Amino acid sequence: MNRRDFLKGLASTSFVALGGSSVLAPLNALANTGLNENEWLTTGSHFGAFKIKRKNGMIAEVKAFDLDKYPTDMINGIRGMVYNPSRVRYPMVRLDFLLKGHKSNTQQRGDFRFVRVTWDKALKLFKHSLDEVQTKYGPSGLHAGQTGWRATGQLHSSTSHMQRAVGMHGNFVKKIGDYSTGAGQTILPYVLGSTEVYAQGTSWPLILENSNTIVLWSNDPYKNLQVGWNAETHEAFAYLAQLKEKVKQGKIRVISIDPVVTKTQAYLGCEQLYVNPQTDVTLMLAIAHEMITQKLHDEKFIQGYSLGFEEFVPYVMGTKDGIAKTPEWAAPICGVEPHIIRDLAKTLVKGRTQIMMGWCIQRQQHGEQPYWMAAVLATMIGQIGLPGGGISYGHHYSSIGVPATTAAAPGAFPRNLDENQKPLFDSTDFKGASSTIPVARWIDAILEPGKTIDANGSKVVYPDIKMMIFSGNNPWNHHQDRNRMKQAFQKLECVVSIDVNWTATCRFSDIVLPACTTYERNDIDVYGAYANRGILAMQKMVEPLFESLSDFEIFTRFAALLGKEKEYTRNMSEMEWIETLYNECKAANAGKYEMPDFATFWKQGYVHFGEGELWTRHADFRNDPEINPLGTPSGLIEIFSRKIEQFGYDDCQGHPMWMEKAERSHGGPGSNKYPMWLQSCHPDHRLHSQMCESKEYRETYTVNGREPVYISPEDAKTRGIKDGDIVRVFNDRGQLLAGAVVSDRFPKGVVRIHEGAWYGPVGKDGSVEGGAEIGALCSYGDPNTLTLDIGTSKLAQACSAYTCLVEFEKYQGKAPKVSSFDGPIEVEI
């Protein structure tokens, strides 16, 4: 089959199960499956719970779950996640890898030429590659410590299945941290005693009742609360609606501090305070200076609940470095006028103030600093532990702040080996290298094996990685600097991907295995990750398309090759696992929350636990810090950390500081050549790269078939660009095409391209094969083509995607066809 025939076979993807047959539905899906087409089935997703009805064995209708009063329109993209030309239909192997194995020409990796093979052959190739790497290099040669959002469901966690099965074969390099909150989750345990970013926050009803001022600092909950780690309830939108009314009535003052007008600011109609990108720490320091000089800070709270204020003050006042952090000092850097800074300092201590931090602010070079400094401001205000006061780092995520039940949640399929199990290759010799590396530094490790770096008080020695495995995971979305990734991938001997779609990660792999979607298998999930509102039956909507299999089935077959199938499955089938997880949860909730038998639960589709309980974060600590100390070394809030100071890092010292960036807009380093700051935040219409494959839904927001790039009117006018133009965005790291959206929500010097846009490189001749070239143009608009791949600091070594400058221009000539979504060039040999 040639590429033209392959694409022709997928051309009817726009048909979404409204009648007739489709080449996207294999015969077994159209046959009598025993699934009743007259009933609504329940399932869940990161976008919320919903119900579907089938026709001719395919999804025909989708509607919101009964309990979801604020469903996101993303459920309109669900059908396109199942029926689309990007689906991995069969096991496939990169052409040259099939011919030469670990001695293949790795410069061809990414040219998208693949050969269809059987499941048996693909799994044996997978095992053979693992055998070769473990024999020649040991566990340091294999990296399988992935990170990612996976699909919802407690049984079919792609990461758990892969790591359990591969772990039965041998040991491997793992990761620490994640891309979402890497800097925050590392610094905050030193300051507040826990990671905070994934902690439950003060209940929304208490905030609405007690807060006088809410500061949304680099935080856009109205956009980000559309999705959740488990099946999302969207209950937080009810509280945002109440907050909107209180803002309108003048009962609560909400201030959005952000480089752009967020969706939340527009929805609430609240105040907007623009701050130049990456300069928030200067604004915070100036507020602290004003609070100290005007004696606005709460000395009693500082003395009773914190440590290190006396070491911090000399830096703020300038006696330490000769630079007083006054509003006049901060204004030229952050772009906020001195009188506004002074007014803001007074506002923060007038009445009850709740600071709500977003996550994107810590995805920059020195991203630890704004989180630390925000905690210091909250300490100086003195309201930590009071209802409607203090600071939170997660009220934009998974309905944190919705009153939660105390019900036990269902367990999950195990990620690790069971007790007393040993892998076939049981070596733990990592040849002097570290067995765990910071999550965002794996490309560094491939390019510089043996290098020693600092990380969170330890020394990390990069292993010599030869093989990588990705399961339901798309690092060619969430990692930075695509061309640097290409250089690294050319050094690998083997890359294996298990996925639903032909993501860019699959494109740059050697062995690709087709997993079915969430909606083509059964599972069970928590309804509401933090609200813990109930349990959801995730009922199979349709049969798996083509030759795709569930994660459970894929790795059960793989384990069988190892002679460990029964060990892997614990001798239980998919439905037996689901029933076991449910019954264990039922037993744990006995006497507290009523749950029916499994058959009744599965038929009705869910169990609802009822309303949750009100709770205030850090209230116990405030009530008695000796009985309820924080998890810091002192048990107190650490404004100054002696432990961090002892590390001796120049880029993360003993207290929060302003540190210049490698590149920064609005007069900062590099802005003469590349004056625009690129904001690559979470998307409006996806979860990262999930749902970008949904063709009809994607077409509701793309511009000229490309990912939108949002541009200020002034910057657009200067470059002769209007709405709908195709724009080339570029810097020294790469180039991409995107569709222009001119909007006054964005100030001069700022452009936005949402992360999650699928990387679609094409050669200079516009060919798909040429996409393997370093420097290739991304035809669709992946912002990580341009971003900087450096660690935040020696402490967290997290990603710094928001430290990124670009330029843009109107694209001249005929734009190449988008290459992101059409699948591989299938070759017959």
UniProtKB/Swiss-Prot annotation:
It comes from the Bacteria. It catalyses: trimethylamine + 2 Fe(III)-[cytochrome c] + H2O = trimethylamine N-oxide + 2 Fe(II)-[cytochrome c] + 3 H(+). GO terms for biological process: anaerobic respiration. PROSITE patterns: MOLYBDOPTERIN_PROK_2, MOLYBDOPTERIN_PROK_3, TAT. Residues 1-31 form the signal peptide. CDD domains: MopB_CT_DMSOR-BSOR-TMAOR (cd02793), MopB_DMSOR-BSOR-TMAOR (cd02769). GO terms for molecular function: electron transfer activity; molybdenum ion binding; molybdopterin cofactor binding; trimethylamine-N-oxide reductase (cytochrome c) activity. Binds 1 molybdenum-bis(molybdopterin guanine dinucleotide) (Mo-bis-MGD) cofactor per subunit. InterPro entries: Asp_de-COase-like_dom_sf, CT_DMSOR/BSOR/TMAOR, Molybdopterin_N, MoPterin_dinucl-bd_dom, Mopterin_OxRdtase, Mopterin_OxRdtase_prok_CS, Prok_Mopterin_Oxidored, TAT_signal. The keyword Metal-binding applies. It is an enzyme of class 1 (oxidoreductase). Its cofactor is Mo-bis(molybdopterin guanine dinucleotide). It holds the Pfam family Molydop_binding. Belongs to the prokaryotic molybdopterin-containing oxidoreductase family. This is Trimethylamine-N-oxide reductase. It comes from Shewanella oneidensis (strain ATCC 700550 / JCM 31522 / CIP 106686 / LMG 19005 / NCIMB 14063 / MR-1).
